[in-house]
């Protein structure tokens, strides 16, 4: 496990088949974040009859993001197997793309983090809250910590990175 050090680049990802949030950190400091959005009206039209193509495009977009930032550390939300096997299969392809990048890259660390783990690390009490309430907590945490208004996809990726930094510095 790579400990945050000088000149260290970290990329955290909250992946899905249609919207994947990402956050980039240098030397344990937040720098930039965004969302790969394949859920726009234009994209829905493009992928209407071909969901496999959407997954391929998401995998390529995530790969290109990894190539652009060349992280020393990759933090990604751990896949929770659900009853929806199709969703699990699709998400495993996106996560597999990230894992492949890690395998093929020298001096890169890969860390899977559970949502309960990063929420706990950042002091977010998840308790018996519903999914939408948990997403809102993440959005509010980013607003209060970084002064940045973001979507839940982006806020989750930022929080994952911040939690990793807190855990290993």
List PLM regions with ranges:
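Phosphate- and other anionic-substrate recognition elements at nucleic-acid/protein interfaces
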Residues: 1-169
